[in-house]
Amino acid sequence: MDILNTVETFDATTHRMAETYTDTPDPERNRIVRRWHVEPIPLAELKAARKAVATAKRYEVETGGILMAGTVIRTDRESQGLINGAYGLARDMLAGGVPAAPIDFKGADGWAEIPPSVMVDIGRAVGLHVQACFRAERQLHEAIDAAEDAAAVLGVDIAAGWPG
């Protein structure tokens, strides 16, 4: 005897196919009609999934670079580390703890000699950019956590509020 699997149409953002079903014999066609049940996705799972999307968006924006005075500044994790090191060195140079000299730096557009004062500006801009990304992610996570139902969770605009 054949089994005809069916499932009612549902919104996959808020519901999913359950692991349960109802079988109805259809002897005229020598088959069983299996109707799979649909269940709402638990609110905690919806929230976790939306927060994961917000986190992925934060990483995308955080590491996507910034534009500063017409120059692209890389903000991937490796570049953040290199910029942070050069920023610390530039601050030491400006404070007189290290002899002042242009900082050799390889950026998105190639090699550059960056004056210490400009390197400090770049370091601050990158740091502020990264902080703004984490602030936006935190605000989204808090809004998702505060949502009382699926519609409110899905109503949180993950594309809004990012620096850039």
Protein language model regions, located:
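A preference for well-ordered globular domain cores
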Residues: M1-G164
